């Protein structure tokens, strides 16, 4: 049995809430700025090319190349699927990837791997699963406003965790895509998870309860980690 990835997100219900809240906001600011500099990715999704596949094979080997081919086929075959069908396929695709920590994979405390790096090493931590599912669903035509990458507290493990939430409509109860579960369940049925923050490419929310969040900011004020965008674009062989 493995431990959750325990991203550097504190539990805001702790007695040290002021310190932990500041730490949580710093973590989210870093991650959000990383993702937001790749803003076109949120709008257009992942790009596949022969150059990308060749790079994957050189960097990670032929098996990794084939995994990216399978991801491309997954995206391209999704046109006729309902959104629940897309969720099921994407959740199953990435949940078969092995779990490991950032320290073990990248020798770093916090490393935000691209979907291609995830498939390259065939391993991920919880942030990587959630982000990879997010990008893939965007590629399939799911609107960004329906998706939120969500930091939660896992009560079973007493650790921080990350999942992807899908909102069928603005006021609907979200569905939770979790690397620890094959089932996609309504948030109200996940009593083992306490949401803390959620975000997408545009906004940031503070959790009010398991089903609702209060918007606490937008993303255009964030301006760090341009390297993530450059890395992702380079991997996809997209001209800057």
Tell what function each PLM region has:
Residues 23-36:
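Bacterial N-terminal signal peptides
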Residues 2-4, 39-240:
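A structural boundary/capping signal
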Residues 1-17:
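N-terminal secretory signal peptides that target proteins for export/translocation
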Residues 16-24, 83:
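Structural motif marking the loop-to-transmembrane transition
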